[in-house]
Amino acid sequence: NGMSMGQHGVWGKGNGTFPMNMYDSAVKVPFLISWPGHIPANTVCSEMISACDLLPTILKLTGLSDKQPTGLPGRSFTELLKGEQREHRDEVVIFDEYGPVRMIRTKEWKYVHRYPYGKHELYHLVDDPGEEKNLYGLPEYKKLVTQLKGRMEKWFCTYSDPAIDGVRSAVNGSGQLCRPGVYAIYEDPFAPKGVE
């Protein structure tokens, strides 16, 4: 998984901070795969893919595409693994299932929205790959923020399950110690255990 090692003053995963962060160092995950005779060795790909793409990819690689459940996000990246071209993906939507933080990322832009209170972020990744200059709130980017937020919210309206949607979850920086929605455990994850 992604792990910040001091970038932005953060040590650990994105869901272990308050507010939760969506810096690339916390959310980007290297993906390595080997299947001699099926996938060419030493292939490097810089296309944007998501964990949602793993299921359709594995099903296609194994000849089981017809077993793909309907209504799920994600698309196969088998062509990329084989060094072939495929239609370019414009965006990847990321969410933090342990709290109300969502992000949409294109090759050029990243928009982070924290429900309900902010701090929201907008980064121009071409000019600012280290995500140091937050452009959110600048008037010249208002239309872009509206477009990115709309695309992100449309994705969640299509694919999220309201019963476990983290957008309404409390945020406390405890990472995976808390569960979203109907699976939430409302206890202090930092309280000493077995002490009266």
Model-derived regions: residue spans:
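Histidine-centered active-site microenvironments of extracellular/periplasmic hydrolases
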Residues: 1-40, 50
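Conserved hydrophobic "DFG−1" position in protein kinase catalytic cores
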Residues: 7, 33, 79, 105-106, ...
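C-terminal, low-complexity/hydrophilic appendages and adjacent surface loops
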Residues: 21-29, 95-137, 174-196
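Proline-centered helix-kink/hinge sites
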Residues: 30, 36, 55-56, 129
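Polar, surface-exposed loop/tail segments
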Residues: 38-104, 141-150, 164-169
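Long, internal low-complexity/basic segments
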Residues: 54, 135-196
